Amino acid sequence: MSEPTASRIETEVRRRRTFAIISHPDAGKTTLTEKFLLYSGAVQEAGAVHAREGRRSARSDWMDLEQQRGISISSTVLQFPYRHHTINLLDTPGHRDFSEDTYRVLAAVDAVVMVLDAAKGIESQTLKLFQVCRSRNLPVLTFLNKYDRPSREPLGLLDEIEAQIDLRPTPITWPVGSGDEFRGVVDRRTGTYTRFTRTARGASAALEEDLSLIEASAEGGRAWQSTLDELGLLDAIGAGLDMPSFLAGQSTPVFVGSALTNFGVRKLLDAVVDLAPAPSPRADLADAQRALDAPFSAFVFKVQANMDPSHRDRIAFARICSGRFDRGMTVTNSRKIGRAHV
């Protein structure tokens, strides 16, 4: 491959972030997916997933059965730009009847966002999916969701993460209040307090105001004092971001918020860009590392039929592992030992 072409591939690789979202059913995974699209500008109004007739359906829930039941059955691949990066987001099924699709998807990503219901913590399906992530040494970012509702104590949730899945939590944002009193988060990296204002039905981006901790302390209140006490404890035990252990799948940066009201969504999406790794070389069938600028190769992780109800079709979703894809090129199918035009 020529040097200019190799350089372009390297540049594009650095701009890519490919990740999946895993969760137990109804933890808010598909709603979070929709809100990522909202904050990226890919959609102008978000439609949260609810199991009721007459409500808007999320963009990633496209099958009739998904829209009827308000759940994700098949993995959806979404691509959108954000902060001069190309984001590939794989919205995976959480319901156990459809989890085989999820396992295949986790072989195609570079990182994972694990969504936990803050009132329930780690649930059975999340635990199963996390074990697949661990077997692949995938970096995991954690989002404690639904803080706009009555929730468990955040310190207790951190203890549960470490005890149940042996993943050391390193909180990045920390809640001020919960339920109806949830007003914002403290960003431990910047030492600022972000105050959120709800929008109608959460259909548009939440209004955000950044304050210094000194400015925020003027608001006072029991919730604020409790937050300061907890932050002091986190600082004392050294619960800060550790990039090497995160990239090795040994620790997890933790963010808090509410996908439904958009609280904390932007900070989580920023973290995907800032913390999640870009694509790296992968082993081929001979277990040899294939350089990113080597001739084209790809891993097909999903084949979907009849996506368009107007005609019969069959589409393969593939993760490009090396080189450049050009429409109409001829490739070798290593499983069938044949060639095909793509």
Predicted features and spans:
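Structural and coupling elements of P-loop NTPases
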Residues: 1-339
